[in-house]
Amino acid sequence: MKRTFQPSVLKRNRSHGFRARMANKNGRQVLARRRAKGRSRLTVSK
């Protein structure tokens, strides 16, 4: 049976990366929340 998680760095960054977050208002809100919380890593990219 094929597993559901088939990792790909490109797809990961395109959907969850920094530039993807910055591309719309809600994504920027995500980054703002994570900055306020004090996360060392804001997104999966970097």
From Swiss-Prot:
Gene Ontology MF term list: structural constituent of ribosome
Biased composition annotated in UniProt, kind: Basic residues: 31-40
Pfam families, alphabetized: Ribosomal_L34 (PF00468)
PROSITE patterns for the chain: RIBOSOMAL_L34
Transmembrane region(s): none
InterPro entries attached to this UniProt entry: Ribosomal_bL34 (IPR000271), Ribosomal_bL34_CS (IPR020939)
GO annotations of cellular component type: ribonucleoprotein complex; ribosome
Keyword Nucleus on entry: no
Keyword terms: Ribonucleoprotein, Ribosomal protein
Region: Disordered, residue numbers: 1-46
GO biological process, any: translation
PANTHER family named among the record's database cross-references: LARGE RIBOSOMAL SUBUNIT PROTEIN BL34M, MITOCHONDRIAL RIBOSOMAL PROTEIN 34 FAMILY MEMBER
Family per record: Belongs to the bacterial ribosomal protein bL34 family.
Protein's name according to its UniProt entry: Large ribosomal subunit protein bL34
